[in-house]
Amino acid sequence: MANLPSCEDYEVSINVPRLIKCPKLSCGHVEKNALGTTINYVGGFCIVFPFYKSDGKKIAVRCWIASVDKAQERTRKIAEELKKVNLPYFVNFEYEQEGIATNSGVQPIVLMDWIAAKSLKDYIKDNLTKPDILRKLATSFKTMAIDLHKANISHGDLQHGNILIRDDGSLVLVDYDSMFVPSLAGFKDEIKGLAGYQHPARWNNENITAKADYFSELIIYTSIMALSYFPSLWAELKIENTETLLFSADDIKSGGTTAIFRKLDSHPELKNLSDAIKKSLRYNSIDDLQPLEEAIISDSERIMGKIRVKWGKRPVEKQEYCPDTTNTRAKWNRAN
């Protein structure tokens, strides 16, 4: 997909019915705001247009603005795998080769179900004064991570813009261009994600892998937990206006020596998470990283776990003795 159209090119074309070549979009229309401006959302590789089909159903139309190697094959294999594993965190999507005509020719597009949900940042912002809800969110996020690990799947670009939360608190992932599924083993790792979420070794990683999310999972989980204890960090770090959550690219490059790590180290419930990030940053390859559910186990918990495995639920078998107080009392009374 060389010489791809610009965002402006796509915006012009999607507003001209005869330039929309995909039959599934026939007689539909792109969404506009009150001023008549076309609504769109731009990422590093795609521009997304909210679109209403002829039956009134709202979908997302994703158009590439940067090349992704073997995009069609990737999309097909990802769709096949997601149907197979049937996890609740993904939406239906279809690759359409004949999508939209532009000055650069007819471009392929991806059609996805539109999800009525809040972005991760919006959800956190709305619940900053509700620590229990944020901790429940962190637990749900960890559960999702475990489910992905069991399926041998990684999203590849976990960050605030690609994680949505429905009203019931359930999580949805969007933007699948960077995903790993087993049938894509050996494909190039081209979409690396945002700097505030990625391990330094990710930038030199060659092929997509099931381990691509391990570090970003730890960053996101820690950020949510930290904000549940220190909601003031939201304003102090101006999180709403950044492309990060709790950690900046400089924080990650520091290896764990910046102020945010010292803040986490000061809280007994967060120090273990801070230590886990620092430990991860000592590795030179993402292949050496641990999944979230293992990374957040403290060293002491890990040791106790090994003891329990070896000795059972009770690490030390203790012989208990309860004296027969009734007989003792009777003997004492007779003696007196």
Predicted regions and their residues:
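Juxta-kinase regulatory segment immediately upstream of eukaryotic protein kinase catalytic domains
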Residues: M1-I39, E73-T75
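Helical subdomain adjoining the active site within ATP-dependent kinase catalytic cores
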Residues: A226-A335
